[in-house]
Amino acid sequence: SDVCSSDLLIVDAAQTAGSQPIDVQALGIDVLCFTGHKALLGPQGTGGLYVRPGLSIQPLVVGGSGVHSFDEQHPAQMPTALEAGTLNVPGLAGLCAGVEWILAQGVETLCAKETALAALFYKNIRDLPNVKIYGDPEMALHAPIISLNIGDEDSARIADILWEDYSICVRAESS
């Protein structure tokens, strides 16, 4: 944070929130954005924004807050100031349940398990013919995500095989 002390440090934690410990104070993070439907185990349509105390940001969209619907002025207090429209209460309840489960297990425990599983997967595929792995093989240096291609095979077909034959759930993307 000393390098850019006059600038804001905004971090996209879509892939890491819930699966990696994140100390916003130690890292000097001013704003942390995250989605709820990935490692936080919440439903789609949920997510959040951490804003460092004392930092003032303006909402992109205002109006229709479910909390102060009849007020002429949009609320200025955080986090209500950034809420436009009706709150997704069922979604937030699902996100809360996911976060509670993660905290009960321990983020560090889950992170270690996911890292070990990714390392085991990497170890078992790295020498297979036609496998192209992208990124650093050292799992401790990044989130436990492995990006790969197998020759010219369709990634959706590979994803189906991994799920049906090995119970490995992956996300297939086409290039």
Feature annotation, model-predicted:
Residues 2-5:
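Short, small-residue-biased leader/transition segments that mark boundaries at the very start
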Residues 90-91, 95-136:
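Conserved PLP-dependent catalytic core of the aminotransferase class-I/II
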Residues 15-18, 175:
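Short acidic loop-to-helix transition motifs that present clustered carboxylates
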Residues 10-12, 33, 58, 134, ...:
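Structural detector of well-ordered beta-strand residues that form the stable sheet scaffold
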Residues 12-13, 32, 49, 95, ...:
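Buried hydrophobic positions in well-ordered alpha/beta secondary-structure cores of metabolic enzymes
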Residues 76-89, 106:
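A short glycine-threonine-serine/GTX helix/turn-capping micro-motif
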Residues 115, 119, 128-174:
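Conserved PLP-binding catalytic core of the aspartate aminotransferase-like
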